[in-house]
Amino acid sequence: MATENKNLSEYDKNTIPNAKDFRFGIVVSEWNDAITEGLYNGAFEALIDNEVPAQQIIRWNVPGSFELIYGAKKMLQTQNVDAVIVIGCVIQGQTKHFDFVCEGVTQGIKDLNVQTDIPVIFCVLTDNNMQQSIDRSGGIHGNKGTEAAIAAIKMAYIRQQASISHSYNQHLLVSGVLQIEDTIKKIENE
């Protein structure tokens, strides 16, 4: 397990961009709620710790992890958010259902990231047993929800910076076109 040597809740606050003006959506699966509530608490507390006001954090619940895709899609379409975190927990059982749900959710969230301009952060535990999930939702390995919140802040910042850069480049392009037009007019008037 990749988290054995890492505490998911640890981060250097000095490396986190200012998040006080960002708005975040969190879509939480009700399935395995003892785990998903722990993940949500970790995410919420990390956002608050990084100066995101509570009223700028929107929470929606969905029945299970597979429904996270639709919930995130609708949040992206209807809420003015800078990033969305999807929180779920799928634990290996004795059937292939685990594989189908994990693959479907992973692909669905990946598709949202490709199709939209707002980052969707994947915080879905896919563990072999309940103890592994407990350990990663506030247990001995920290809280994956905290890690997801920090990723959401960083990705919202990247989105913001890309938008600023794009706007600046558009400004330069328009300015350049206007300068060319002015030069052409001067030449024509000579």
Predicted regions and their residues:
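Glycine-rich phosphate/diphosphate-binding loop of Rossmann-like nucleotide-binding domains
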Residues: 14-62
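Short, ordered loop/turn segments at secondary-structure junctions
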Residues: 30-31, 89-90, 125-129
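Accessory alpha-helical/coil subdomains and C-terminal extensions
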Residues: 171-190
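Generic secondary-structure signature for well-ordered alpha-helical cores
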Residues: 3-6, 33, 48-53, 73-80, ...
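A charged, well-structured terminal subsegment
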Residues: 142-177
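Glycine-rich phosphate-binding loop
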Residues: 67-109, 113
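N-terminal amphipathic/basic leader segments beginning at the initiator methionine
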Residues: 1-20
